[in-house]
Amino acid sequence: KDDVLLTVDDLPAGSTVRLAVMDRFDGNVWNLSDSTMASDSSNYHRVGDSIANNAAGKRFTAKFTVDDGLSDYWLPMAGAASSVKFATSSDADSFYYNTDTMSAIYPSRTSPGLSYTETGVIPRTPTDKEIAKANASSISQPKAEDVPDCVDKLATAIAGGQSKGGEAAQALADKLRESGWFSHGLNGD
């Protein structure tokens, strides 16, 4: 618990760092879907000097330095990146970014001393009232497989009477959090 894996300078207070994105759960194991399952969540592309994104929020520029103990294919990031500059230019050749999930992969694997500067936006977190008023969006997700019938029945029982998609999502999140099945991984979850 006390090992330093990553040092980040100049990130706005309260910002989170995304270490990985797992969007597929088979009931036992979280995993990353491939491009045949969900086009939105598996679109990693090499990027040049800038990354197009439409995120609104607090702009930042932060320096990341990988310390001992972090050797992974995921490149830690914060918010929605608009550019990533590596201390060593050849390191940029192994950088891939997904604008839909605001996440990055680094096939050469991170290693101690890897240093990069991310410029981007920490998206504004909507209020509970704004979420409740929101309609559901349509996104491409992996097909849920082997889901017991009781899951659909429980979801309908919890959220079926809500008039907006946001209200339904909040009702589901609240009930699952109360039962210990849901967390954003943040303090207080």
Task: Give residue ranges: language-model regions.
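Acidic low-complexity segments
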Residues: 88-189
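Beta-strand-rich, non-transmembrane domain signature
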Residues: 1-93
